[in-house]
Structure formats: C-alpha cells, structure tokens
C-alpha cells in the first residue's frame, strides 16, 4: 500500500514539473535591440557663428594646450645667449636682475618646448603682452618665441616649431590662462581638453584654484609644472598678495590686482573672434567681483557646434 502511494506522489510531482516547464516556455524574452548604450546627451548647445565656421584651422588633430606665461622681454642681440645676459632683459620693477632668475625664465621656455614635443597633439603658446619697461619694442611672448628658435628648439623634434605660437595680450595670470585658451581656439577652431602651465611652483595654487576656477575649467584637466625661483621668499610674499587680490577680484579687472593692465591700451580682440564666449565677455565688461555663473563651451554637458 505504501509503495503504491509513493508511486502516485512521484507521478504527481512529475506532472507538476512538466506543467511548470510548459508555462515558462510560453513567457517571451524581451527582444534584443543590439544597440550600444546611448552616450550622454548634452544639455546645452553653443553654436559657432557663420564666420567662425568658415575659418580653416591653422592646426588640426590637437587637444592639449601648453602655456608658458612670459614674464620679461630680452633686448639683447643674441637670443641664444639670453640665459647668460641678465642685463639685457627688460624686467619688471619687482623682478630680480640676477643671472639665476633669467636662467629660470629660459628654463620655463625649454620645459614648454619639451612638453609640447612629447605630445604631437599639443599646441605650445607663449603668452604675454608688451612691457612698460621694454616699451613697445616687442611683446614678452614674442621674445620667448625668439629665444626658443635661437636655441634650435632645445634639440627636440623640429616639428614642434609648427605647433608653437604666441599670445600677445595677456598681462596677468588670469589673462594668461583665458587668452591662451582663446588663442588655441583661434588656431584649432575648438577648445583644449587639457591644459599644461609652466611657471614657478609657488604660483601653482593661484592657477589651479583661482584662475581655472574663474573660467570654469576642471582642475583634473590641468597640469602645472613648477620650478624653484632663486628669490623664493620674495616671490612667495608677492604671490600671497596676488592670491588675495584675485580671491577678491577673480577677473583681475581692478588695479588692486597689481597687473600692468594693458599699459599701451591695445585691447585684446578675443571678444570679436571667440563669439561662443559672448555672454562671458558681456559679463566681464561690468568688471564683476563674483565668478561667472553661466556655462562655458568647455563645461560638462555643453556641445559646441
């Protein structure tokens, strides 16, 4: 009797199992779309002007901007010996005229050249306008370019010369950063995805936490290559004052920042050539003390077309 009952139970379990399998087979699996996941959609679109779209880029296939802020003008006759002739440099009043200091300036030029040579997709920009002490003879940026050429581009691949340019209007740290980005746009018709700045290491915090922040660039996209200065203590004191000034006045449009502020009244033309920053230029015209709250062409979620 118990054997027959066990057999009936076993047959019942089998029947239930087959019924369950049949029900599962009738459930249709969702169709596969075979589509890759969608990329993040830009929330804001900024458009190039018709004039901007017609301009042929001077350089292509580039994405990194290497900036060397130019600090002085070399007035000597032999640019190849610029590091040896401190007396032939038109230095600002608060700069030391020692040989060690001018060697540091030439070192910055060389580092910039070597950094650009390491990356074939990099553009090197020497940035700096005219100096009061040098008069209207030459811009600081042009002087740096001449030193690099006279030193045969410091022995690196000569092709780096075709990717080296000047930005000849900047007069303070914020302008070095912003105007060099604008110069990159003029050359490549797009904005850089990475920025490398060469300077004294005591200035690193100002560039990272003040200047880039004021123009909406992510710190993670910036590399700062800093060197020691022969007048380290003196430079650190001046730098602390500069940081305090830019913290109060992020765009450096007031005299308390201490820059030369366009001494020859030669206004930069970037507001007319980089029209995708139109709203930002308008904001700067009011000489604001607060950071711009709008979006930039390089802001996350923005597409420039």
Task: Walk through the language-model features, giving the residues of each.
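N-terminal signal-anchor transmembrane helix specifying type II single-pass membrane topology
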Residues: 2-32
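A structured, mid-to-C-terminal "fold-capping" secondary-structure block
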Residues: 227-305
């Amino acid at each position: 009797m118990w054997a027959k009952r066990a057999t009936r139970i076993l047959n019942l379990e089998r029947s239930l199992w087959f019924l369950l399998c049949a029900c599962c087979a009738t459930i249709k699996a969702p169709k596969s779309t075979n589509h890759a996941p969608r990329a993040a959609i830009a929330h804001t679109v900024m458009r190039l002007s018709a004039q901007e779209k017609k301009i042929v880029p001077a350089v292509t296939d580039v994405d990194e901007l290497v900036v060397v802020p130019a600090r002085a003008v070399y007035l000597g006759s032999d640019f190849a010996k610029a590091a040896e002739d401190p007396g032939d440099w038109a230095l600002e009043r608060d700069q030391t005229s020692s040989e060690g200091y001018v060697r540091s300036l030439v070192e910055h030029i060389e580092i910039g050249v070597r950094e650009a040579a390491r990356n074939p997709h990099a553009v090197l920009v020497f940035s700096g306008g005219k100096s009061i002490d040098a008069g209207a003879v030459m811009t600081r940026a042009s002087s740096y370019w001449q030193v690099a050429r006279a030193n045969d581009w410091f022995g690196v691949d000569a092709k780096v010369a075709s990717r080296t340019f000047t930005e000849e209007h900047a007069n303070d740290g914020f302008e070095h950063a912003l105007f060099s980005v604008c110069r990159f746009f003029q050359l490549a018709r797009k904005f850089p995805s990475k920025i490398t700045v060469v300077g004294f290491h005591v200035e690193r915090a100002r560039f990272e936490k003040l200047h880039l922040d004021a123009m909406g660039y992510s710190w993670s996209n910036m590399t700062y290559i800093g060197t020691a200065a022969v007048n380290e203590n003196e430079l650190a004191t001046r730098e602390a004052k500069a940081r305090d000034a830019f913290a109060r006045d992020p765009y450096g449009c007031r005299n308390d920042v201490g820059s030369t502020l366009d001494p020859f009244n030669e206004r930069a033309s970037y507001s007319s050539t980089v029209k995708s920053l139109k709203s930002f230029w308008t904001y700067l015209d009011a000489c604001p003390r607060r950071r711009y709250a709008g979006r930039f062409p390089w802001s996350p979620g923005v597409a420039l077309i």
